[in-house]
Amino acid sequence: MTEPSFNTSALIEESIKSAKINVGAKLVLAYSGGVDSEVLAQGLSLYAKSHPEFRYLLVHVHHGLSRNADAWVTHCQKQALDYQLPIEVVQVQVKTGPRLSIEAEARRARYKAITSLMDSADVLLTAHHLDDQLETVLLALKRGLGPKGLSAMGALQVFDGDKQLLRPLLNVSREQIEAKAASLSLPHIEDESNTDDKYDRNFLRLQIIPKLKSRWSAIATTASRSAALCAQQQAVIDDEVSARLPNFIELVPYGEGTALNLDLLSHQTPNWQALLLRGYIESSGFAPVSQIQLEQLLSQLLTAKPDANLEVRIADMLVRRFREKAYLSSYRPHKPKSLESIELTLESEVHFVQEINIPLLSNIRVEVLEDDGGERVRLPLIEEKVSVRFSAVGSLRCHPHNRQKGRELKKLWQEYGVPPWERERVPLIFYNEKLVCAVGYWVEHSFQSAEHETGLRFSIAIVSNECESI
């Protein structure tokens, strides 16, 4: 029988020290009640007794997938009482469907539920162990992943933007954990789905890994070492990509977005083209794309005709090409909603800062300023109604303050490099029926505030989270 040659609370302490956690932070344990999380919960209860400077919480997620799920809740609540640790039970609904992985969807729902109970300073602890790491490496190989995927799981990782995830048992084998539970007579649940090898991890755990271990007993340890080396190499790549990528990114002249300069990208080697595009996608908050998807996307972006307005959808990401630049946005299946004209009621006081909410888009910030070197619109006359509109006819003539002569609106959009899909989202300020300002771009020459004269400045103050649903 395997000896439980580890001290759980000591591993927790070592893990927490490496993370440099602030006093008062909450240590949140993902607690299923299985043998792995049971051992970690028992160790956390011992650690908590000597470390009152932290707060503690066990979180059990009820997935609703097993007829035994209610009994598991009862077990976890009883154990939490014995451990003298607070527990929160969260019930979730797991998406199911012919093209959905129950494993992946359950994991996604579980992490979403747990993170909803965490603040940015809090830390998540999970009971992943050495054999889980081997499974993750094998699955990465099956999927054809590179160094990033083969890095598998780290003992310390950042997730959900700014939260830390710790895996104190990552170098402990399943056999050691089971021996530990037996030595402490710890009760734990057995999830009946763990014996169903139609799930990839179960297939590896039940059919493949035992054979690998019978031939190479240390394979879990050596696979973990390879994962650590891949993580080390990936960190170097990530650092270099982070250093180079800003040279290829441009701020768009509207909103708060960016675009990738394809002309500059085309002068890089194929390997760097792929690394930089992947880095741009992931740094923009989108899920990693496969190697095949990346190669196809690169080919389409870099070989399209100069005047081509390419549009490619990958999962929930929409990639558009316009004037040698690539733009990323979230894909929404619904037809864009129309942005209606809104009449603005400006405050009567001359000196004010006012924000007018534009549903579905943003807030328009209106400032009354004396001469500050910027371009301003003269104050409206009593008989002039002020309104904000969208999608004015392209034949409308405008004379921007920074142009020698007037041109049709559709020509000005081209001159200013505004992509076609953004033109209907630019707020246009009207005095009665006269366009006086394209917010973020220009002030109409004949409505420009004179030097040393008080005027209005319009700007986009806040881009709402609903912006992409338009």
Curated annotation (Swiss-Prot):
EC number: 6.3.4.19
UniProt: ATP binding residues: 32-37
Domain of life: Bacteria
Reactions the enzyme catalyzes: cytidine(34) in tRNA(Ile2) + L-lysine + ATP = lysidine(34) in tRNA(Ile2) + AMP + diphosphate + H(+)
SUPFAM superfamilies listed in its UniProt record: Adenine nucleotide alpha hydrolases-like (SSF52402), MesJ substrate recognition domain-like (SSF82829), PheT/TilS domain (SSF56037)
Compartment(s) where it occurs, according to its Swiss-Prot or TrEMBL record: Cytoplasm
Primary enzyme class: ligase
The record's note on its domains: The N-terminal region contains the highly conserved SGGXDS motif, predicted to be a P-loop motif involved in ATP binding.
Function: Ligates lysine onto the cytidine present at position 34 of the AUA codon-specific tRNA(Ile) that contains the anticodon CAU, in an ATP-dependent manner. Cytidine is converted to lysidine, thus changing the amino acid specificity of the tRNA from methionine to isoleucine.
Entry protein name: tRNA(Ile)-lysidine synthase
Organism the protein comes from: Shewanella woodyi (strain ATCC 51908 / MS32)
